[in-house]
Amino acid sequence: MSEPPFDDDQHRISRRMVIAAAAALAVPIAGYGDAVSQDATKVARMPDTKSTWPHGARLAVSFSLMFEAGGQPISGAGGVIPDPIQQGLPDLPTNAFFEYGVYEGIPRILDLFDKHKIKMSSFMIGHAVDKAPDLAREIVKRGHEAAAHGRTWENSYALDPEAERRFIADGMASIEKVTGQKPVGWNAYWMRNSPRTLDILQSLGFLYHIDEPSRDEPFIVPLKGGEFVTIPYTFHLNDIVSFPFVGWDAAAYEQALRDEFDQLYEEGSHRRRMMVVSLHDRISGHANRVRSLDRFLTYARSKPDVWFARKDEIARWALSTRSATPIINRGPPTVTGLPGSAA
């Protein structure tokens, strides 16, 4: 997808960068016995110019739609029932809960975002795409990004290097075969990657990942193969955390979205700010939650200078505005405990 048109002279607005080089970190990393040194994580180049989002926007808002139904294990996936089923037995109601995402949730969410003319990034599990190819194609047909979420809905961080690469590449191949779009974005199961994942992703052609909740703006991490973008995640705006575990109702979630938006929008007058929200097919696709999202989107769209963007657009924008994008040099994840290059 092409980058949004912009004219630096016409659309650049004032901003004050507040990212400062971190003080020395001397926190022991559990399991390694080493301290994070002053040089383990640092800002490689401080932005020295004013910057904006496209067209002078003061806030970028990006939604993720998690397409997971059919990619979960038949037993032990977890859901709304607090008592886990006996190991090895099919969890019938939980699997039916996942099916809701295909038959009701995603179609309802797609219609809502069509109404508001907003495009999302859909993180798709390979097996989910294989089982519901028409739905995957429909997501892309409506202008949303097809991003990768693994071959199945399970951890991959403990796999050996070749197995991890296959796990990522297999899911990627399913998405490209069905939708015609090669994924450039990655989200791991519960954000847990191995120390080498980012290097693997880059070698496969990915531009960005979202598996780090450390900032409210995108940044670049240099890897051995070049620059790689991080588009930070937000746990507290993830519906899978808010609804089943915290026990929020739709009204409380809507208020949290508004509060997050208002604070970041205010900060956006002098800092580049970004708000990201993750929606799951089987959770936010329920009728009352879509109604709540509808009200929030109406509110957010009423504000001027807001850029609603897919995450691939944000990643490309970050790479095209290097003078204004933090570049974070990190040591190996086994030393820093943070995502980076294993080399």
What residue ranges belong to the model's regions?
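N-terminal secretory signal peptides
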Residues: M1-I13, A21-V27
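N-terminal regions that are enriched for targeting/export leaders
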Residues: K42-F97
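Signal peptide processing junction and immediate N-terminal pro/mature segment
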Residues: G31-Q38
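Active-site-adjacent pocket scaffolds in enzyme catalytic domains
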Residues: A40-H55, A173-R271, R322-I327, A342
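C-terminal domain-boundary segment and adjacent tail
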Residues: A44-M46, Y208, I220, R258-A343
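Conserved, mostly hydrophobic/aromatic
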Residues: M66, F113, L201, I231, ...
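Residue-level marker for buried hydrophobic side chains located in beta-strands
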Residues: V61-F63, A146, W307
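Metal-dependent polysaccharide deacetylase catalytic core of the NodB/CE4 family, i.e.
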Residues: Q86-P90, P107-L110, D114-P195, P218, ...
